[in-house]
Amino acid sequence: VDTVVAGNRERDHRTGFTTPPKLTLKSLMSFAAHPKWTLNYLLHEKFKLANVAHFTNKGSSIAKGVMEYINEQYDPAMSWKDAEYCIKRWQGPFALKGLMSVEDAKKAVDIGASAIMLSNHGGRQLDGSRSPFDQLPAIVDAVGGKIEIIVDGGIRRGTHVLKALALGATACSFGKGFLFALGAGGQP
């Protein structure tokens, strides 16, 4: 239930972000301004999203190729009944991600979820929604102790984790740090 449709990645559309990069006057100027990055890109194995690469066209825009494929995987008709069915079939711990209201948190408890992940995708996917930190105290008051509450989105450093735990979260997830590390190729 993370999100029922892919996010509108306005920055990717605006900047013309593609993989691999397309040669345009703007991209050539960027390559010239970043010679170390450009040389590294030309001399090493090309970046690819291995888990979806075989579903997209080579040279397609991330915003159009990969995101179209991912968007096709979402079901905008996902319902609480569907979530309950999945939980019963799975017969193990089951987390529902993307919940942001007290009502949804209570419903997750009612259908047997073992955890909820409060998430607005760091404001990137759901930029008009409140932050998980804004929602956390009310959700903890309503369902704390009945279900694991994981804060996802907006976690950038250890003090954010401490604040979330102090407000009653059970745990935090921290994806961007790992993505930044992968993006840097392990280099400082």
Model-derived regions, located:
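A short alpha-helix capping/helix-coil boundary motif
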Residues: 61-63, 82-85, 117-118, 139-141, ...
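Glycine-rich phosphate-binding active-site loops on the catalytic face of alpha/beta enzymes
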Residues: 1-5, 111-132, 161-187
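Glycine-rich loops and low-complexity Gly/Arg-rich segments
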Residues: 22-26, 119-122, 141-144, 174-176
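Short, basic, helix/turn surface patches
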Residues: 26-31, 126-132, 141-153
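Active-site entrance/lid segments in N-terminal catalytic domains of soluble metabolic enzymes
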Residues: 1-110, 122-125, 134
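Structural detector of well-ordered beta-strand residues that form the stable sheet scaffold
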Residues: 95-97, 117, 150, 173
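Short, low-complexity, polar/charged sequence segments that are solvent-exposed and flexible
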Residues: 17-20, 115, 135-138, 168
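Catalytic cores of alpha/beta
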Residues: 100-112, 139-151, 155-170
